[in-house]
From Swiss-Prot:
InterPro entries: Prot-tyrosine_phosphatase-like, Protein-Tyr_Phosphatase, PTP_cat, Rhodanese-like_dom, Rhodanese-like_dom_sf, Tyr_Pase_AS, Tyr_Pase_cat, Tyr_Pase_dom
Sequence ranges of Polar residues compositional bias: 290-306, 340-363
Residue ranges of every copy of the Tyrosine-protein phosphatase domain listed in the record: 433-698
EC top class, as a word: hydrolase
Molecular function terms, GO-annotated: MAP kinase tyrosine phosphatase activity; protein tyrosine phosphatase activity
GO terms for cellular component: cytoplasm; cytosol; mitochondrion; nucleus
This protein's name: Tyrosine-protein phosphatase 2
Recorded family membership: Belongs to the protein-tyrosine phosphatase family. Non-receptor class subfamily.
Length: 711
């Protein structure tokens, strides 16, 4: 069961589980490790997975568990409760993806979500927070290694985190080239830990190597290690034997000599550089290149390391005290090929050490394999067909309603204050929709959607798998006991009118559609169809009425549909039908059918045309709810119902400006009410802004004379 708790409820629930000594509960922190290291809730586990992995179905909960650094291994059945939190409500989409992995993995116990985010929780409950001191970037690191381990040392600088178009939130590419020899230890996708240690069986040459950790060195320890190893290493520290934190290494890594001469060159950390070429215990998304240094082993050819050939070179001597070869890694920007270089697969490169400069990945420079597609030229409608590079789209801006990074909205959206206000109102509606989606699988929630997927036969009735009705508002068919009463349709009660919003009928749901119309309408009814039968070469709706007056559509159960009248109105661009429904032992029913065939998917219609059509439809006799459908039953359907509501209310209720509070904005409240009864109503920003255009049209005083479509 999923529970969305406030900060006070979250704290009290945490304390209640802490008092239960026999219960096992996990507190999972989904923030970046840089924030987790500053402060976090007591006993919280940091799971800083890339968003791409969280959204990947193949990356199941078992792989998530493999990435969690925890000394105690437990199964899902042993965990009594799970507590999840992120920085703020903006991280709810990441929490939702992780919750889905727990549910698909068979975890059915309670999951508690912090709705206010960590910042609000930390300010109100500081006693439940653990704070640590961040390690500054300017402080060098050292690694504790067993004194008996006589190994060559790679001198690597600690670069500042850089962003790549593939992974904008992390300092490493999501894809690394293949055929790279594995590192000493298999790094996890968690940004702060190695999830596995190197075993003696896998790495027999490292029997004397002990786990190591990073901490700030002292001058005395550096001098003592220089006398032993010829490099600033410290003796082993037993206090950190059980820890193995991971320090992110981006492609922009610089070389360092053993005798640094500048302050920048003194920012060095060290890692063992001669791990044997054996398969690690588990493949990882990022690896530190590490090659064997013994003379009897063949060095990898240039083709095998071509993805790193731009910033990795082989050098005979890096440290004068080392007799074997090591690797020297330099940034790409500062590479210069020597004119006397020999054609032996490697080249001598000269550069100035710049450890704080990140990799720019310009289009004219060669790219490593994992980043080659990132700057691929593409087309965008904003540029009217011109080619542009993704890196030149401008700076990233914070996205308060979804992913952590997002491109800024189009310039035309923020061209004026009114449009910008409408844009951010729509994004707030999207955030509320995301919050409701967290309770889709909660049977006690108003947003539960379990009835739409109880069996395969029921799932086939949905035209789109991601658009289903809420169980609370769905239409239930009047069927015999033991038969499914499901249809993808929802009762909509807004204002003083009632509607039934549904998807377009499929070939297998024609009987369900007409049974719904028969049982929910009186002597007279109205159906509004807002889609064509085919759009862009794909079927959007099955024809559910006879072709002409001479033929009737007979369905199971004795239901008979015949066409009594047909008209076309070119000025309003609408076709009208009058259907007669007959059933044994029942009076006939007359259904007025309005087919608007010029309103295409994810667009908006002409204002004068749609307002004239709605005024005419409202004059047609109707004894029940109005049936409205497009293809999915959410975008055009929700926009039509919202426009109908705008025409029903007095003009003094309509907003005169867009810069109103959400609670005082009629359109915002109307769309939010529609979405609380059927998901994704008024599907995109273009349709949402169209509602404000309708209000401006009505406030301008323009009135279209309407005539009845049917008499």
């Amino acid at each position: 069961m999923l529970h969305l708790l406030s900060k006070d409820e979250f704290n009290s629930t945490l304390k209640s589980f802490e008092e239960q000594t026999e219960s096992v509960s996990w507190i999972i922190d989904l923030r970046l490790h840089s924030k987790y290291a500053v402060s976090h809730i007591k006993n919280a586990i940091n799971v800083s997975l890339p968003t791409a992995l969280l959204r990947r179905p193949s990356f199941d909960i078992g792989k998530v568990f493999a990435c969690i650094k925890c000394n105690v291994k437990v199964s899902l059945d042993e965990i009594n409760a799970i507590f999840l939190y992120d920085s703020s409500m903006a991280g709810m989409n990441r929490i939702y993806d992780l919750v889905q992995k727990f549910r698909r993995g068979g975890y059915s116990k309670k999951i508690y979500l912090l709705s206010n985010g960590f910042e609000a929780f930390a300010s109100s409950h500081p006693d439940a927070i653990v704070s640590t001191e961040m390690v500054k970037e300017s402080v060098p690191y050292k690694i504790d290694i067993n004194e008996n381990c006589k190994l060559d040392i790679l001198h690597l600088s600690d670069p500042s985190a850089v962003s790549t178009p593939i992974s904008p939130d992390y300092s490493f590419p999501l894809r690394v080239p293949i055929n790279i020899p594995p590192p000493l230890c298999t790094p996890s996708v968690v940004s702060d830990t190695f999830s596995e240690f190197a075993s003696h069986a896998e790495y027999p040459g490292f029997s004397g190597l002990t786990p190591f950790s990073i901490h700030s060195p002292t001058a005395s320890s550096v001098r003592s290690c220089q006398s032993i190893y010829g490099s600033p290493l410290s003796p082993p520290n037993s206090a950190f034997q059980a820890e193995m934190p991971y320090f992110p290494i981006s492609p922009a890594i610089s070389c360092a000599s053993s005798c640094p001469s500048t302050p920048d060159e003194q920012k060095n950390f060290f890692i063992v550089g001669n791990a044997p070429q054996q398969t690690p215990a588990r493949p990882s998304l990022r690896s530190v290149p590490s090659y064997p240094s013994s003379n009897n082993q063949r060095r990898p050819s240039a083709s095998r390391v071509r993805s790193f050939s731009n910033y990795v070179k082989s050098s005979n001597v890096v440290n004068p005290s080392l007799s074997q070869a090591s690797l020297e890694i330099i940034p790409r920007k500062s590479m210069k090929r020597d004119s006397n270089a020999q054609n032996d697969g490697t080249s001598t490169m000269t550069s100035k050490l710049k450890p704080s400069v990140g990799l720019s990945n310009t289009r004219d420079a060669p790219k490593p394999g994992g980043l080659r597609r990132a700057n691929k030229p593409c087309f965008n409608k904003e540029t009217k067909g011109s080619i542009f590079s993704k890196e030149n789209k401008g700076p990233f801006t914070c996205n308060p309603w979804g992913a952590k990074k997002v491109s800024p909205p189009p310039c035309e959206v923020l061209a004026d204050l009114n449009t910008a206000s409408i844009f951010y109102k729509f994004k707030r509606l999207e955030e509320m929709e995301m919050t409701r989606s967290l309770a889709f699988n909660d049977s006690k929630s108003d947003w539960c959607c379990l009835a739409s997927s109880r069996s395969t036969s029921i799932s086939r009735k949905n035209r789109y798998t991601d658009i289903v009705p809420y169980d609370k508002t769905r239409v239930r068919l009047a069927v015999p006991k033991g038969c499914s009463d499901y249809i993808n349709a929802s009762h909509i009660d807004v204002g003083n009118k009632k509607y039934i919003a549904c998807q377009a009928p499929k070939p297998g749901t024609l009987l369900d559609f007409w049974e719904m119309v028969w049982h929910n309408s009186g002597t007279n009814g109205v159906i509004v169809m807002l889609t064509n039968l085919y759009e862009a070469g794909s079927e959007k709706c099955s024809q559910y009425w006879p072709d002409n007056k001479d033929h009737a559509l007979c369905l199971e159960g004795g239901l008979r549909i015949s066409v009594q009248k047909y008209e076309t109105f070119e000025d309003l661009k609408v076709n009208t039908h009058l259907f007669r429904l007959d059933k044994p032992n029942g009076p006939p029913k007359y259904i007025h059918h309005f087919w608007v065939h010029t309103w295409f998917d994810k667009t908006h219609p002409d204002i004068e045309s749609i307002t004239g059509i709605i005024r005419c439809i409202d004059k047609v006799p109707n004894d029940g709810p109005m049936f409205v459908h497009c293809s999915a039953g959410v975008g055009r359907t929700g926009t039509f119902i919202a426009v109908d509501q705008i025409l029903q209310v007095p003009k003094n209720i309509l907003p005169k400006t867009t810069n109103l509070e959400d609670s005082k904005d009629f359109i915002f409240n109307c769309v939010n009410s529609l979405r609380s009864q059927r998901m994704k109503m008024v599907q995109n920003f273009e349709q949402f802004k169209f509602l404000y255009d309708v209000v401006d049209y009505l406030n301008s005083g323009v009135n279209q004379a309407s005539k009845p479509l049917m008499t």
